[in-house]
């Protein structure tokens, strides 16, 4: 028996290497394998949003006007969620609800599921794009890892939360004012601001803003002067090979200000990555908790005392009453299918009124 040792020669016209070479070759806008997911999904998501906000009404799902055609502007137009009666249907154009009728599909809220799913895959494709580009340019994949934060928030808010509720109806609609309404909804129905995961998310995002401002100002303040220009933008050569700012000077400054300072660039920049990404992940975990209707902090003793003593009130008890007011007003307006009618005497009033 003869055993041949060696490489198997590929056919000249083998399709996979040709496609791989074309996708990953160096060009002005990199395509890559991730681009097969990113570009079509991003195109359809953006195109669907522009189409929906321009032409499509929310009259049949929310009883609202939501398009430019109906008189909305950029801040008030939205692609709204499907009606509550459609539960978690994918609302495919060819599905049993629309039966291939594009107009009916739009009226039922099919564009929302179209946007949510294509938007989610577009974000995932963008993260894969960062992974794919990291290797050829010899980077570590921290950009892609950090982008998992926004993806986690998007998936938790737009997909996981409504999956835990009765339908897509309770997810945010895609629009500026619609997102604001959803934030008020989260507060009124879940007391979102008093949840520890929301607090960690706020600390992460605002902490990252502070770190970003401090870092940018410090680097700008400690740049080496290598020219005689009159201002920052003309005094420095952007192509110089050596380091352009002084870590030692920055460390000395912040040591005097705070008593402590970063002495290692890698730890400093990792911390700037860690704080916002962790904050976004904590927010996403908190929203998953809301999908399961997990409760926030309850200070029942304060509620009982406020109910018994007209002169006792705390910011917490005022917020609880505010939440009840949001629920009473919003449920009747936002869920017309429930036919809720609240008489004036049951609407909450604080002790101070």
Curated annotation (Swiss-Prot):
Cofactor binding, note field: The D1/D2 heterodimer binds P680, chlorophylls that are the primary electron donor of PSII, and subsequent electron acceptors. It shares a non-heme iron and each subunit binds pheophytin, quinone, additional chlorophylls, carotenoids and lipids. There is also a Cl(-1) ion associated with D1 and D2, which is required for oxygen evolution. The PSII complex binds additional chlorophylls, carotenoids and specific lipids.
Record GO cellular component, one term: photosystem II
GO aspect biological process, one term: photosynthetic electron transport in photosystem II
Record note on modification: Only phosphorylated in mesophyll cells, phosphorylation increases when cells are grown under high rather than low light regimes (70 vs 900 umol photons/m-2/s).
Binding site for Fe cation: 215, 269
The UniProt record lists the keyword Acetylation: yes
Domain of life per record: Eukaryota
S-S pairs: none
Binding site for pheophytin a: 130, 143
Record keywords: Acetylation, Chlorophyll, Chloroplast, Chromophore, Electron transport, Iron, Magnesium, Membrane, Metal-binding, Oxidoreductase, Phosphoprotein, Photosynthesis, Photosystem II, Plastid, Thylakoid, Transmembrane, Transmembrane helix, Transport
Described purpose of this protein according to its UniProt entry: Photosystem II (PSII) is a light-driven water:plastoquinone oxidoreductase that uses light energy to abstract electrons from H(2)O, generating O(2) and a proton gradient subsequently used for ATP formation. It consists of a core antenna complex that captures photons, and an electron transfer chain that converts photonic excitation into a charge separation. The D1/D2 (PsbA/PsbD) reaction center heterodimer binds P680, the primary electron donor of PSII as well as several subsequent electron acceptors. D2 is needed for assembly of a stable PSII complex.
Family listed: Belongs to the reaction center PufL/M/PsbA/D family.
Protein name: Photosystem II D2 protein
């Amino acid at each position: 028996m003869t055993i041949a040792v060696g490489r198997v020669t590929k056919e000249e016209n083998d399709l996979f290497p040709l496609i791989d070479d074309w996708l990953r070759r160096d060009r002005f806008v990199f395509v890559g394998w991730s681009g097969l997911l990113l570009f079509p999904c991003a195109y359809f998501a953006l195109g669907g949003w522009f189409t929906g906000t321009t032409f499509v009404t929310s009259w049949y799902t929310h009883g609202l006007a939501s398009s430019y055609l109906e008189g909305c502007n950029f801040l008030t137009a939205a692609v709204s969620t499907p009606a509550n009666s459609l539960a978690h249907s994918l609302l495919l154009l060819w599905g049993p609800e629309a039966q291939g009728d594009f107009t009916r599909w739009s009226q039922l809220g099919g564009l929302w599921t179209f946007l949510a799913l294509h938007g989610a895959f577009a974000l995932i494709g963008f993260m894969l794009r960062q992974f794919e580009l990291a290797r050829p340019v010899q980077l570590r994949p921290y950009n892609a890892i950090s982008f998992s934060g926004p993806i986690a928030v998007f998936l938790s808010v737009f997909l996981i939360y409504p999956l835990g509720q009765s339908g897509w109806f309770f997810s945010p609609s895609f629009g500026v004012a619609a997102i604001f309404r959803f934030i008020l909804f989260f507060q009124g129905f879940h007391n979102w601001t008093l949840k520890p995961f929301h607090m960690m998310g706020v600390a992460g995002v605002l902490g990252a803003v502070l770190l970003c401002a401090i870092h940018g100002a410090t680097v700008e303040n400690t740049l080496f002067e290598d020219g005689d220009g009159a201002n920052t933008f003309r005094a420095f050569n952007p192509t110089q090979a050596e380091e352009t700012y002084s870590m030692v000077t920055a460390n000395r400054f912040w040591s005097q200000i705070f008593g402590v300072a970063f002495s290692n660039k890698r730890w400093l920049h990792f911390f700037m990555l860690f704080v916002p990404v962790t904050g976004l992940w904590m927010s996403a975990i908190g929203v998953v908790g809301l999908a399961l209707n997990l409760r926030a902090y309850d200070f029942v003793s304060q509620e009982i005392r406020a109910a018994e003593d007209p002169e006792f009130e705390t910011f917490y008890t005022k917020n609880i009453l505010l939440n009840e007011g949001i629920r009473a007003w919003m449920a009747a307006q936002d869920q017309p299918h429930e036919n809720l009618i609240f008489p004036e005497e049951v609407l909450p009033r604080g002790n101070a009124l």
